[in-house]
Amino acid sequence: MADNEEDVEAEEEYTELTDISGVGPSKAESLREAGFESVEDVRGADQSALADVSGIGNALAARIKADVGGLEVESETEAEVEEEGGEEAPDEDVETELQARGLTEKTPDLSDEDARLLTQRHRVGKPQFNRQDHHKKKRVSTSWRKPRGQLSKQRRGIKGKGDTVEAGFRSPTAVRGKHPSGFEEVRVHNVDDLEGVDGDTEAVRIASKVGARKRERIEEEAEDAGIRVLNPTYVEVEVSE
């Protein structure tokens, strides 16, 4: 009798999707849009199917299954693990390598003049513009400061004392600020920022504050739209012989 009462209480406890641990109104709406209308639908679904729902992910899907599925799911999982553990598979050395996601080899459509100017910019280069006496005093950093002393040899332009910042060192105007590949960089923080990006002349750089889950969605959308990501995520994959 006590066990039956506990089962009834457990069933009555979850009447709405929002009663499940970790599921708020927004995530409940995402579950409904994916076809999970009730708690019973969630209880009968696989963890992988829940993880594919927008805004859920694998970690929250496991939490939902643990909360809704009860102890029966956990005991079955443990039993399966114990049965599989009896046979020890031989260790195989699998060669892996890191590969970048997305269109890493894509190049922009450049005119002959822009291609020439990019080559010129790379060939000529720029001085480092280090601060005067940075190599003499530890407290002096390398960040550029204009020399102002009357006896400063760097200010007077004496050879070997370091270059000073002047307009003549700037890059050609047509390719100024472009990525070495020739793309114009566009900074993105979410999927919506990809709208309006021209994949033939522009490439995106994902902001450093973007999390792993949102970064993955941005990279997938960029690849589908034919847009190159300049700072892609590297994943470990097996090397095919």
UniProtKB/Swiss-Prot annotation:
One of its GO terms (biological process) is translation. The keyword Cell inner membrane does not apply. Residues 1-47, 68-182 are annotated as: Disordered. Pfam families: HHH_5 (PF14520), Ribosomal_L32e (PF01655). CDD domains: Ribosomal_L32_L32e. Coiled coil: none annotated. It comes from the Archaea. PROSITE patterns: RIBOSOMAL_L32E. Residues 133-159 have a biased composition (Basic residues). Keywords: Ribonucleoprotein, Ribosomal protein, RNA-binding, rRNA-binding. GO terms for molecular function: DNA binding; nucleotide binding; rRNA binding; structural constituent of ribosome. Residues 29-44, 103-116 have a biased composition (Basic and acidic residues). The keyword rRNA-binding applies. One of its GO terms (cellular component) is cytosolic large ribosomal subunit. Residues 1-16, 73-96 have a biased composition (Acidic residues). Binds to the 23S rRNA. HAMAP family: Ribosomal_eL32 (MF_00810). Part of the 50S ribosomal subunit. Interacts weakly with protein L15. Belongs to the eukaryotic ribosomal protein eL32 family. This is Large ribosomal subunit protein eL32.
